[in-house]
Structure formats: structure tokens, C-alpha cells
Amino acid sequence: MPVKCCFYRSPTAETMTWSENMDTLLANQAGLDAFRIFLKSEFSEENVEFWLACEDFKKTKNADKIASKAKMIYSEFIEADAPKEINIDFGTRDLISKNIAEPTLKCFDEAQKLIYCLMAKDSFPRFLKSEIYKKLVNSQQVPNHKKWLPFL
């Protein structure tokens, strides 16, 4: 039988942890959903979509799937006039373009880092000041609401 911890964590506390850093936000499904809604309102949801596609891509084991997923990411986010073209520098875009014929699991790493930094420095701080985030925090301030956190 699992032992329950004696500490409480309210939904508000969970929502507040998203403000600690972007990794905490991205690791939480509700936080990720809220961030995506915010980015969509700013017409920049392609950034988090690209980041998520890269995270999924890095888990790919099958060589054929690596090639097909890489081409899909390239055509959706990297190539000129892509439907969800991300804003990366020419050098990074050019390097990916040259390597896409024989992609590796690391072929998008540099672009993913650039997009992560862009979101962390620009979008994430604005999200924390947004009405979307404030409403989430305020709506979850329910008196005497307690949620047990299982230790095991």
C-alpha cells in the first residue's frame, strides 16, 4: 500500500510552479495546454509545436521512421514558406537543409535550442503576465481544497 505524504498541494500551488521555469511548464500537460493557448493568441504556436515535434522525433528508434519524421518536420517547420515556418537564422536553416537527406536524431538540435531560448526569453515571461495565466491561478484558489501527493 503506498504511503501518502503529509504535505498538501493545491491546484493553485501546482499552477504556481509553472512560473519557476519553462521546463516545469512544458512537463505539465495542463501547463503545456495553457501555454499553447497563449502562443496561439500571439500567433506563435509554431514554436512550441516545433519543440514538441523535436522531442517526439528524438525518441524515434526505427531508421525508416527517423527519415520520414525528419522530412515531415522539415517540410512543416523549416523549409522556406513552410506552413508553420519557425524563425531561425539562415545558417541553422541551411545546415538542416544540407543534412536532411541523411537525417540523424540530432539534426534539429540546434534549431530546437534556438526556439527553446526564444520561448524562454520572450514568450514565457509574457505568458506569466498574461490574462490566461492569471485567470488559471485565480480560478484555482478554492478555499480548503486539498490534494494528497503520493510519495510512492
Swiss-Prot record:
A biological-process GO annotation: transmission of nerve impulse
One annotated GO molecular function: GTPase activity
Domain of life: Eukaryota
CDD domains per the UniProt record, alphabetical: RGS_RGS21
Family annotation (PANTHER family): REGULATOR OF G PROTEIN SIGNALING (PTHR10845), REGULATOR OF G-PROTEIN SIGNALING 21 (PTHR10845:SF160)
Function statement: Inhibits signal transduction by increasing the GTPase activity of G protein alpha subunits thereby driving them into their inactive GDP-bound form.
Name of the protein this chain belongs to: Regulator of G-protein signaling 21
Lineage per the UniProt record: Eukaryota, Metazoa, Chordata, Craniata, Vertebrata
Gene of this entry: RGS21
